[in-house]
Amino acid sequence: MSEIEKYHWVFRIHVVDRAGALTSIASAFSNEGINIGTVVGHGLEEPALVEGSVVLTFFSSEEKKDIMVRKIQRLSKVIRLEERPYDSHSLRKSAILHTTRKLKPLDVAGENSFLTCELVGSEIEGFTYFLAGSPSELDPVLHKLEKNGVVKDIVYSILGL
């Protein structure tokens, strides 16, 4: 029996009210046996007329992804859903890195584009950087830094454009 090919997907889900929206979205994924890789919420701290959004990543077959599109769109708090493959050029990924040493320009050079790299702070324990770029450019840089033992800690998110 051949294994079904899984792809990396990104959903940006626009919601009316974030209270309970994330729970219902996570439940829909859990019911289908799909693990959410990354989840980021965007909204305002004070109640407003502006919609919030939830951006998440996951791996699944195209068929399961289509099932999730239909399930998520039917949720009462969902206004609309945007779906993209993880390697879409319209997506951007950002990361906050705690490193063991100061980064050099070659440490953060993408293969086909420049990445944003900003030194946020330095302390005795190391350095803190903000990095951003397309996932296809940023991921190899992050993996290289991790492999070389430069990364102490990392927090990242996906932002749909």
Residue ranges and their predicted role:
Residues 1-9, 14-51, 59-161:
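Long, contiguous binding/interaction regions
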